[in-house]
């Protein structure tokens, strides 16, 4: 039996409303994941330069090795045949959906997807929701390390993500961490402020996931760290991120390493905690 025209109109309206509700119901974490996959596809189809220019925000940062505008940096690089593939494995979104971060693993092949030379990486991306509802990366940073024992492809999002009531600022409550680093040492400071599900990311090492693993690494190295005053800080709901410079000094006070650090802070059980902590050294001049 043929449908009448009014019935077709009603069905079309119902279908449109259903599709709209499904889009609206999409979780922010899922949207970040989908954005990551679209980003990776753009890199594969258009090249690394164009892909990053498209998905970095206008003021997005990269470390090259100093902090600089990511879009401008990629515009000034010559075209590259390199292949870059990745898997987001951890996504957390602020309570108001305005800010998010993702962590994942990646493989870089300088001469393209058939290149037998492979570099293994982990990255940290910070995402900011744009006026049109889409997300752009305001920071993209990564570390290199030997080939890991496994390369996960599934992603997770903390079950408590986005459920915290914000009563105080990360900017104020992070200060005691930096003070404690100076007065009581790195291990005690991180033991006090690291989240149980934190990622500690250090160049040359596969990331340490979880407070216990991170503290074990810090206790074995016991670095004397000096943090510079923050250069970049952004807070939205129960999530915040900060970036600046750090230096590591030996017992005589001589600087042995200098670089950029990024920290993601999240509010859990009324306390701001470090969710991700990345150090990326700046090579000494001449290297």
Enumerate the predicted regions with their spans:
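Bacterial Sec-dependent N-terminal signal peptides
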Residues: 1-31
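Short, low-complexity N-terminal intrinsically disordered segments enriched in polar/charged residues
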Residues: 24-49, 53-54, 136-138, 145-187, ...
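A solvent-exposed, acidic/Ser-Thr-rich amphipathic alpha-helical stretch
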Residues: 29-33, 47-98, 187-238, 255
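Short, structured motif recognition centered on aromatic/hydrophobic residues
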Residues: 39, 99-103, 124-127, 135-136, ...
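Generic short beta-strand segments
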Residues: 58-59, 103-109, 243-249
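Hydrophobic/aromatic beta-strand elements that line small-molecule binding cavities or substrate pockets
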Residues: 74-75, 88-93, 106-108, 122-129, ...
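Short beta-strand edge/turn micro-motifs at domain boundaries
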Residues: 118-155, 260-283
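Hydrophilic extracytoplasmic domains
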Residues: 224, 232, 238-287
């Amino acid at each position: 039996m043929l449908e009448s025209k009014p019935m077709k109109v009603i069905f079309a309206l119902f279908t449109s409303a259903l599709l709209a509700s499904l889009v609206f119901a999409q979780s922010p974490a899922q949207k970040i994941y989908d954005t990551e996959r679209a980003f990776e596809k753009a890199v594969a189809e258009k090249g690394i330069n164009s892909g990053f220019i498209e998905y970095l925000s206008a003021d997005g940062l990269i470390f090259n090795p100093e902090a600089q505008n990511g879009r401008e940096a990629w515009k000034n690089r010559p075209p590259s045949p390199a292949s870059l593939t990745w898997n987001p494995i951890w996504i957390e979104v602020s309570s108001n959906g305005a800010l998010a971060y993702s962590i994942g693993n990646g493989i870089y092949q300088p001469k393209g997807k058939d290149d037998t030379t492979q570099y293994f990486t982990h990255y940290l991306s910070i995402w900011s929701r744009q006026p049109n509802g889409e997300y752009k990366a305001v920071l993209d940073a990564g570390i290199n390390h030997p080939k890991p024992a496994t390369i996960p492809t599934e992603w997770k999002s903390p079950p408590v993500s986005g459920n915290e009531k914000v009563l105080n600022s990360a900017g104020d409550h992070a200060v005691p961490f930096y003070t404690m680093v100076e007065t009581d040492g790195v291990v005690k400071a991180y033991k006090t402020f690291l989240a149980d599900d934190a990622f500690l990311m250090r160049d040359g090492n596969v990331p340490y996931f979880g407070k216990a693993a991170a503290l074990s690494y810090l206790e074995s190295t016991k670095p004397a760290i000096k943090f510079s005053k923050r250069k970049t800080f952004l807070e939205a709901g129960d999530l915040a991120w900060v970036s600046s410079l750090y230096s590591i000094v030996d017992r005589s006070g001589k600087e042995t390493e200098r670089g950029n650090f990024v920290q993601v802070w999240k509010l859990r059980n009324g306390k701001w905690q470090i969710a991700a902590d990345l150090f990326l050294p700046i090579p000494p001049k001449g290297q």
